[in-house]
């Protein structure tokens, strides 16, 4: 009997699929149930963020950063304000640095809780999201108490943070850590030894160290390949060089390793949070939270009620903004998903000439074809869950 040429089967995955993690559309080419090719279609959440930021003053551009990786908003703001401070040569007081580090680590836990639990849900486990989101809700309340917003914070400002934390909030964050570690242990015991979860993740989506470097991987994706590359250690910023924490690395470079690294990173983040809380309540208790350079930091409201100059200063700062010296800087932070970078070009005016945002998820999604080729169709959802995609930052 003559051999019949069977054409490969093309299907659409998303953009309405619950496992697509946002508005991802992937065109999958299948040979039976084996994936031959993956073509991710992006741009469904493109809002022209970089261009919009060039039309706003440095203070007005800040909130756009919250809308990129909206799972952990303050981590993006961190990179932008560090870039502005590098241009201006401004030093942030130690208390301001500690508050920034504290909320960056809260953001990391927010991100990893969402990712780990939804990764488990993608392969059929329904309990982890219910447990994980209970802890996330507590952290969102800390966000709300710090700046008034649960999601779009706009809390990190050039020169420091918008306002000091009440002592009761710092104490409550400290009291949150131990119960959280117990809850994390229960989540760990539920997912990690689970036979089905292992079968769906072990030896799936393997990437070598050389391939990971060549494809621009960062964060958990590069550490999963066995490289201890973490910007908090390798290029320390703020007061990370004064913190004690470890960097978990994988050895098999598969989806299961990436899950284990995220679980351990949450424990390390809790460790950093505890160190920040201890210092905020003792040695750095009554220190300022923002730079004393009043060119970029607005005056206090109590000053504005009595001083005409303070009122004029406040008005000028929020209408015209401040000017930065001409130049260009690139600043990267270790965001929960990887290296989030801001390339800022200033022409000496009160608005950035060019802002380029380097989103880690973009490089990771590009590798989807390479990671999924040769796997089964069902493995595509497991791989997508493990690379941790949020479309706000991919599409920008």
UniProtKB/Swiss-Prot annotation:
Coiled coil: none annotated. Its main location: membrane. Keywords: Cell inner membrane, Cell membrane, Membrane, NAD, Quinone, Translocase, Transport, Ubiquinone. It is an enzyme of class 7 (translocase). Pfam families: Complex1_49kDa (PF00346). One of its GO terms (molecular function) is NAD binding. It is a peripheral membrane protein. It is found in: Cell inner membrane. Its EC number is 7.1.1.-. The keyword Cell membrane applies. It catalyses: a quinone + NADH + 5 H(+)(in) = a quinol + NAD(+) + 4 H(+)(out). GO terms for cellular component: plasma membrane. NDH-1 shuttles electrons from NADH, via FMN and iron-sulfur (Fe-S) centers, to quinones in the respiratory chain. The immediate electron acceptor for the enzyme in this species is believed to be ubiquinone. Couples the redox reaction to proton translocation (for every two electrons transferred, four hydrogen ions are translocated across the cytoplasmic membrane), and thus conserves the redox energy in a proton gradient. NDH-1 is composed of 14 different subunits. Subunits NuoB, C, D, E, F, and G constitute the peripheral sector of the complex. PANTHER family: NADH DEHYDROGENASE [UBIQUINONE] IRON-SULFUR PROTEIN 2, MITOCHONDRIAL, NADH-UBIQUINONE OXIDOREDUCTASE 49 KDA SUBUNIT. Belongs to the complex I 49 kDa subunit family. This is NADH-quinone oxidoreductase subunit D.
């Amino acid at each position: 009997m003559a051999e019949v040429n069977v054409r490969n089967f093309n299907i659409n995955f998303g953009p309405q699929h619950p496992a697509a993690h946002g508005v991802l559309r992937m065109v999958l080419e299948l040979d039976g149930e084996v994936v031959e090719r993956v073509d991710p279609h992006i741009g469904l959440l493109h809002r022209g963020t970089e261009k919009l930021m060039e039309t706003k003053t440095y203070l007005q551009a800040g909130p756009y950063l919250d809308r990129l990786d909206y799972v952990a908003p303050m981590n993006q703001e961190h990179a932008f304000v560090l870039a502005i401070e590098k241009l201006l040569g401004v030093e942030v007081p130690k208390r301001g640095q500690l508050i920034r580090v504290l909320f960056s680590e809260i953001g990391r836990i927010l991100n990893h809780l969402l990712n780990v639990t939804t990764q488990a849900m993608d392969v059929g486990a329904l309990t982890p999201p219910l447990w994980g989101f209970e802890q996330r809700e507590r952290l969102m309340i800390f966000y709300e108490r710090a700046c008034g917003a649960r999601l779009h914070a706009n809390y990190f400002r050039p020169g420091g943070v918008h306002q000091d934390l009440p002592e009761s909030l710092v104490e409550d964050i400290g009291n949150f850590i131990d119960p959280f570690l117990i809850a994390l242990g229960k989540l760990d015991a539920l997912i990690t030894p689970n036979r089905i979860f292992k079968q769906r993740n072990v030896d799936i989506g393997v990437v070598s160290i050389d391939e990971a470097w060549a494809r621009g991987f960062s964060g958990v994706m590069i550490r999963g390949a066995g490289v201890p590359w973490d910007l908090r250690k390798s290029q320390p910023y703020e007061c990370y060089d004064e913190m004690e924490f470890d960097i978990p690395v994988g050895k098999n470079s598969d989806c299961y390793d990436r899950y284990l690294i995220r679980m351990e990173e949450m424990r390390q983040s809790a460790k950093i949070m505890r160190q920040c809380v201890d210092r905020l309540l003792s040695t750095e208790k009554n220190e300022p939270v923002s730079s004393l350079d009043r060119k970029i930091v607005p005056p206090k409201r109590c000053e504005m009620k009595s001083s005409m100059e303070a009122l004029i200063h406040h008005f000028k700062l929020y209408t015209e903004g401040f000017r930065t010296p001409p130049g260009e800087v690139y600043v990267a932070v270790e965001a929960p998903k990887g290296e989030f970078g801001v390339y800022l070009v200033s022409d000496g005016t009160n608005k950035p000439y060019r802002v380029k945002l380097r989103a880690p998820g973009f490089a990771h999604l590009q590798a989807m074809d390479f990671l999924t080729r040769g796997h089964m169709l069902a493995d595509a959802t497991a791989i997508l869950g493990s690379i941790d995609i949020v479309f706000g930052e991919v599409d920008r």
